[in-house]
């Protein structure tokens, strides 16, 4: 609060006026940022991004991805990402309006990858992005891959899950730090969803049967930002397995059997946060509680 004595405007009125100004700051509701993933087997010489991509059926073993490990510690805000993509956002945007804006915008995967590495201060990865994008396109046999930025309750999933923030604002969600590597991987997952990838797996069972495998991301992974009730999903991967008669049985019997196998979907949900009971005992930092 600030107070100052001010002289009267008219000299024949005696005394002074006391002017008081008070500033009231309203704290935004707390928000968490999180994603859901699978624990993957670590192979010597493999990169973090390479392991993540294998989890959604993209084996890019012939492409060097180790340099992307430098993104693991970098944080990017959604607001900064939208600005880098040339998408204007009103300063007073509400959470519902922000969800609608994000869900209604799609950007080219290449542009998104470049914006992420640039904001993370890793400009040296811009050339690596070209090789990465070409490798993904070669696997899918497609070009012009697009990424939907947001999600609505009953619509397709985008890069960011639907933001749920009781009492929060769109501006606070735009300023939450999100892991750059998570953004990169999730962007690729969204862009490649619904497209089958040849895994390169082909088995011959003693000349009796042969099996070929393709995989597709039916539902992409997502990154969640929000308060209690916010949810994030891992990628739901569907495998297409074709069994055919091998060389030893080809003259006796013919088998051509397609099989579809779905991986279990993982969901993470914030059920409590920033309460005294959840504070870290040694540092006192606020924490969130999740249901997976």
PLM region spans:
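Short, conserved structural patches
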Residues: 1-55, 206-210, 216-221, 225-292
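Non-membrane alpha-helical secondary structure
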Residues: 5, 44, 73, 108, ...
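Residue-level marker of intrinsically disordered, low-complexity segments enriched
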Residues: 7, 34, 85, 91, ...
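Charged, amphipathic alpha-helical linkers/stalks
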Residues: 28-120
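Charged, long alpha-helical assembly modules
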Residues: 119-260, 264
């Amino acid at each position: 609060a600030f107070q100052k004595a001010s002289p009267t405007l008219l000299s024949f009125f005696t005394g002074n006026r006391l002017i008081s100004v008070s500033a009231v700051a309203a704290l935004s509701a707390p928000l968490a940022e999180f994603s859901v993933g699978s624990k993957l087997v670590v192979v010597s010489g493999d990169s973090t991004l390479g392991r993540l991509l294998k989890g959604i059926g993209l084996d890019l073993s012939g492409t060097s991805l180790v340099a992307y490990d430098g993104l693991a510690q970098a944080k990017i805000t959604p607001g900064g990402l939208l600005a880098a993509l040339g998408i204007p956002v009103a300063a007073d945007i509400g959470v519902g309006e922000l969800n609608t804006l994000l869900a209604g915008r799609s950007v080219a995967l290449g542009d998104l990858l470049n914006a992420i590495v640039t904001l993370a201060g890793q400009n040296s990865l811009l050339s690596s992005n070209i090789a990465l994008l070409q490798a993904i396109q070669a696997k899918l046999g497609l070009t012009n891959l697009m990424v939907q930025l947001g999600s609505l309750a009953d619509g397709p999933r985008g890069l960011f899950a639907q933001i749920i923030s009781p009492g929060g604002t769109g501006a606070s969600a735009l300023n939450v730090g999100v892991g750059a590597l998570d953004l990169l991987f999730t962007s690729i997952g969204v862009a490649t969803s619904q497209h089958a990838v040849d895994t390169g797996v082909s088995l011959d069972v003693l000349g009796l049967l042969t099996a070929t495998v393709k995989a597709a991301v039916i539902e992409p992974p997502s990154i969640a930002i929000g308060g209690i009730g916010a949810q994030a999903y891992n990628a739901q991967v569907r495998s297409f397995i074709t069994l055919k008669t091998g060389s030893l049985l080809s003259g006796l019997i013919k088998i051509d059997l397609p099989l579809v196998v779905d991986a279990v979907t993982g969901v993470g949900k914030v059920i409590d946060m920033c309460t005294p009971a959840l504070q870290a005992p040694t540092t006192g930092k606020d924490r969130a509680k999740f249901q997976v």
